[in-house]
């Protein structure tokens, strides 16, 4: 029995990487019976049938799972924001940070298009990034000429997935790091006589110190798995200062003897961060339950 990570899935065949050796595997019938399918990122135990093929017997417990695209066991969520077109948004950034923490992923903030930004706006963005750096978030502000190898290798060990809204440069980053992915995709689409909206299969590729998914990541923010009382745990400074509030169930809104409100008044919590917390708390409080 061998253990490896699924790096690719096509038509019920799962390619498993075991220390650089590849095996094309299929799940045992028990998986179909239980209506459970392995996904890219899963760590699996499989039995080798011949030199390069085998059957999956067991899928290890997932530490997290992204639905769109379906990827499991993600270590790093690279939140890609652009300086311009679209403009840098702390509100959107904070929402992606909440998603990252809710799935127990380590977030990193990557801002693109520095070369297209005025010096004044660069300074404004750098001042905002300092707020996040003071909370121990890792940040990068890059231009088109950046050393892409160094950018990707700085993320540390494990599986990284890019996230961010359309137009921020996720696909550009991936195609620069893997220059043959786009060519291969176009070739396959043309061969299958499909349009430009051909669905891509998720695949993991090796990078320095780990893997990265070749998908441009997810851009839709889904909070269905988050309850309103959990949001305070995903704003790092609010979680930290909230530990000394008078009441353990304090949501830091109108409650008495709230340490978060006191630290906000003292300037230790950025007003825009607190405002974004309130907005998200209200949204989740007002959502209709799905049945």
Swiss-Prot record:
GTP binds at residues 112-115, 164-172. Keywords: Cytoplasm, GTP-binding, Hydrolase, Metal-binding, Nucleotide-binding, Ribosome biogenesis, RNA-binding, rRNA-binding, Zinc. GO terms for molecular function: GTP binding; GTPase activity; metal ion binding; rRNA binding. Zn(2+) binds at residues 245, 250, 252, 258. Its cofactor is Zn(2+). Residues 63-221 form the CP-type G domain. GO terms for biological process: ribosomal small subunit biogenesis. It is found in: Cytoplasm. Its EC number is 3.6.1.-. One of its GO terms (cellular component) is cytoplasm. Binds 1 zinc ion per subunit. InterPro entries: G_CP_dom, NA-bd_OB-fold, P-loop_NTPase, Ribosome_biogen_GTPase_RsgA, RsgA_GTPase_dom, RsgA_N. It comes from the Bacteria. Its main location: cytoplasm. One of several proteins that assist in the late maturation steps of the functional core of the 30S ribosomal subunit. Helps release RbfA from mature subunits. May play a role in the assembly of ribosomal proteins into the subunit. Circularly permuted GTPase that catalyzes slow GTP hydrolysis, GTPase activity is stimulated by the 30S ribosomal subunit. Monomer. Associates with 30S ribosomal subunit, binds 16S rRNA. Belongs to the TRAFAC class YlqF/YawG GTPase family. RsgA subfamily. This is Small ribosomal subunit biogenesis GTPase RsgA. The gene is rsgA.
């Amino acid at each position: 029995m061998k253990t490896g990570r699924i790096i690719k899935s096509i038509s019920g065949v799962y390619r498993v990487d075991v220390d650089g050796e590849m095996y094309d595997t299929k799940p045992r019938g028990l998986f179909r019976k239980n209506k459970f399918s392995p996904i890219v990122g899963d760590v699996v135990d499989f039995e080798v049938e011949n030199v390069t093929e085998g059957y999956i017997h067991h899928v290890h417990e997932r530490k997290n799972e992204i639905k769109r695209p379906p990827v499991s066991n993600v270590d790093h969520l690279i939140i890609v924001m652009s300086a311009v077109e679209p403009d840098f948004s702390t509100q959107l950034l904070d929402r992606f940070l909440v998603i990252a923490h809710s799935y127990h992923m380590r977030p990193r903030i990557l801002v693109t298009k520095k070369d297209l930004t005025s010096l004044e706006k660069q300074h404004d963005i750098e001042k905002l990034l300092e707020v996040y750096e003071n909370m121990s978030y890792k940040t990068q502000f890059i231009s088109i000429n950046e050393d892409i190898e160094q950018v990707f290798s700085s993320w540390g060990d494990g599986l990284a997935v890019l996230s961010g809204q359309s137009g921020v440069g996720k696909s550009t980053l991936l195609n620069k790091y893997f220059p043959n992915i786009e060519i291969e995709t176009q070739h396959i689409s043309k061969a299958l006589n499909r349009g430009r909206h051909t669905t891509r299969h998720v695949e993991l590729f090796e990078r320095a110190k780990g893997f990265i998914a070749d998908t441009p990541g997810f851009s839709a923010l889904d909070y269905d798995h988050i309850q309103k009382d959990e949001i305070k745990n995903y704003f790092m400074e609010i979680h930290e200062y909230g530990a000394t509030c008078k009441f353990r169930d304090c949501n830091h809104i109108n409650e008495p003897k709230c340490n978060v409100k006191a630290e906000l008044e003292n300037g230790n919590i950025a007003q825009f961060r607190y405002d974004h917390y309130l907005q998200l708390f209200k949204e989740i409080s007002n959502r209709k339950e799905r049945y």
